[in-house]
Every structure is written in C-alpha cells, then in structure tokens.
Amino acid sequence: RWIATIMVLWGIASTATMFATGPTSLYVLRILVGITEAGFLPGILLYLTFWFPAYFRARANALFMVAMPVTTALGSIVSGYILSLDGVMALKGWQWLFLLEGFPSVLLGIMVWFWLDDSPDKAKWLTKEDKKCLQEMMDNDRLTLVQPEGAISHHAMQQRSMWREIFTPVVMMYTLAYFCLTNTLSAISIWTPQILQSFNQGSSNITIGLLAAVPQICTILGMIYWSRHSDRRQERRHHTALPYLFAAAGWLLASATDHNMIQMLGIIMASIGSFSAMAIFWTTPDQSISLRARAIGIAVINATGNIGSALSPFMIGWLKDLTGSFNSGLWFVAALLVIGAGIIWAIPMQSSRPRATP
C-alpha cells in the first residue's frame, strides 16, 4: 500500500509541474516531485526481498529495472511527438509532456493499491502449499548466508542499535559505490540525446530520439542476460564490478573517436554496463543489513548515493562549457565508475552456498 501511495503522490506532483509559471514555482514543484518519489526505489527493493530469495534476486531486480531503459527508449521517441501538441487546447507542448507522462502514474498507483499484495502470506492467488513452499525458500535463504571476514556477527548485530548498524564502514562503502554509479545513470538519461546530437549535427529531434532509443533496447537484453548469469553462478561481487568497468570503457570509447558508429557503440556499452551493475548492486546491501534495519539502510544508500545524479549533470555541463565538448565530462564519469568498481571489490560480502537455479 505504501508503494501505491508513493506512485499516486508522485504522479500528482509530476503532473502539477505543468502549472509552473516561473523559475520559483518550477523549483518548488520539482523539489516536491523529488520528495514524493524518494521512497519508491527503496520500497520496491525491500518489497522484492519479501518475495524472492537471494539466489533469484538479481533476475527479479533486473526485470523490475528493465522499466528504466524501456521508459527511456519510449520517452525518447514519444516525447518528441508530445511536444508537437503545442497549442492544442491552449496548452504548450511542455505542459502536455508533464500531463501525459505524469498522470498515468496516478492511475497505475490506484491499480497497485488493489492488486499488489503486501507479502506472500496475504496473496489470495497463492494456494496454501505455494505459500508454505515460498516461506520455506525464504527461511532457508536466510540460513544459508555465510558471513565474510570482517562482517558483523548475528549476535553482535542484535546488541547494537539499528542506527549504529546502518552507519558502518560497509554501508558507507555501498553508498560511495552507488554514488559513482548514479553519476553515469544520470548522464545516460539526461545527456545521451545531446551527446548524440553533437555527434550527428543537423539531425532532427525525432531522429535523435530514435537513435537514443537504440542503447536502451540493447540494455534490456544485456540486463536480463547478465542478471541470469549472476544468479546461475551465485556470484555478486565480480558481476557488479565488471559492468562498472564495461560502462567506463564505453564512455572512453565514445569520447575517443569521431566515427559515429563507434561513438554509438560506446554509448551502448555505457548503458548496458550501468544498468546491469545497478540490477545486481541491489542484491548485495541487504545481505549486510539485518531485516529490522533493511528498509532504512536501503533508503540511506539510495538517498545519499543519489547525490551523484545531481552532480553529474552539473559537472558534464560545466566541463562542456569549459572545453567546448562532451569528452572531458565523459572522462569524469568514466573515472568515477573505475573508482566505484574498486570500492565494490573492497567490500566484504556475504554469499550463499551454490545451488542450481532455473
């Protein structure tokens, strides 16, 4: 129900942005959008831990997060056509954009309120046998976790306050690693069309929108493959860190040549690596945080790490103004990804005993 509430409020705030009349009202409304959406991703990630055991969670995360490249691809194509509605019913194109892309969240939130069950034991569509089987899987999942060297023991975890459990070096390392990742995610969502425009001078907005959809389509396939590979191998550390480096290589490739096809290949690599890393990244923090602190812990990592999504647009824009090209901004994002990969490899992680998965 909390997820449904967030979606409705988020949709209302996003739609209300169409009524902005100046910089002040726009800033206030955008801050309101940020406040209403803040709990959505942590809430979904926590919700998935109630339904899927750790050995299946990379795929579960990926299937949920596939929505990001899907909406980015569709948004790149659809937004150009929505903006062409400028003047219809006395509304400007940008107002139609907020209305048609914000209001569906309200409708979907209402549907979620009635259709999405809070936990397996409340799911009417599951039989008693299904509920029992799923609960046994979740119980066994908790028992098979192996403590790595340097991790907090269960007894010690029970003796410390929830806040002391959250603000540990391990959680802070996760936060820094996520900060490095959100920089590239922001660069993909905000700057890809403009980067492609700089590579393809003279192309129309619709053409650029279609080109911007290509990396996202490739990303969908890459995310699903890499998450399945991680679940089959029951390995998280390398499956998280390597996509960081793959994305960094993509940004460097895009900045190193003037050949359009190679630049597009670099952006595709950056998109696949970034989103694949994100899907598997979120399978790991919950293994270092107890159930009682999991919701707040995930929220802390998400909220603090998301500062990177605000830094990246500023830095890339500033460096472009300073140098006259996107290259230095792409180097900045690539450097953060390399640092993030190093942090991931340095984090002590729990693991599950290997088991076959479908």
Cite the ranges covered by each PLM segment.
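Primarily marks hydrophobic transmembrane alpha-helices of the MFS/SLC 12-helix fold
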Residues: I3, L26, H239-T240
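Symmetry-related core transmembrane helices of the 12-TM Major Facilitator Superfamily/SLC fold
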Residues: Q95-F114, L330-A346
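A late C-terminal transmembrane helix in Major Facilitator Superfamily
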Residues: S288-S325
